[in-house]
Amino acid sequence: TENVEDLFEKFPDGFSVVNLWLYNNTELRVEVKGNPDTHQVTGVIVRRPIQVEENMVEEYKKAIYFDNGQMKMEDGSQVPEEFKDFRFLFQSFHFKESFFDMATFNVKKTSYTPGTSNYFISYYAKNAELAKYLKVPEDSQLKVQFEGDLQADEEHRFTRIVDVEAVDSRKSFFEKIHAE
């Protein structure tokens, strides 16, 4: 999907997307919701230091919207530097079969939680395109984890999380897409 607004084709009843980056002791987060009535995609961007405290103070939290796939600030100001070239993973990368052919399946990291119906499957892979999205060297070893919910799957309520971590650095992100 090139534009965030194109998600309405897959999720006509609306959607929410969270994209969270962790690096250099900083959390950068983009949260948006797609309104099915107006077809507008609005949300917030947040920057805050990663601390081991209950109430992490946000350096800033600002309202955003998307127009033709581009992030815009609700107040008309410039998009902060760390979000200037922001694209969701689903806009930038598609997990094709060839990715899984070349990835190493990590059986120890496969899990199903009976009490919650949550599951995840982890892979280790080297993928230049995904490394570029994570802004690490192209030959970096990546841990890629897919998460979902069996009960939601059975009820045709779509929720997927992709979690990517560069193994040799402390840089990671996750993206969650949820159908409303």
Stretches found by the model and what they are:
Residues 1-26:
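N-terminal leader/targeting segments and the immediate start of mature chains
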Residues 12-18, 40-42, 115-122, 157-160:
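Short, hydrophobic/aromatic-rich segments at coil-to-beta transitions
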Residues 19-27, 45-53, 163-170:
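Short, flexible beta-strand-to-coil junctions
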Residues 29-88:
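An acidic-aromatic
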Residues 80-115, 128-131:
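Extended amphipathic alpha-helical interaction segments
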Residues 119-180:
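Gly/Pro-enriched, hydrophobic low-complexity segments
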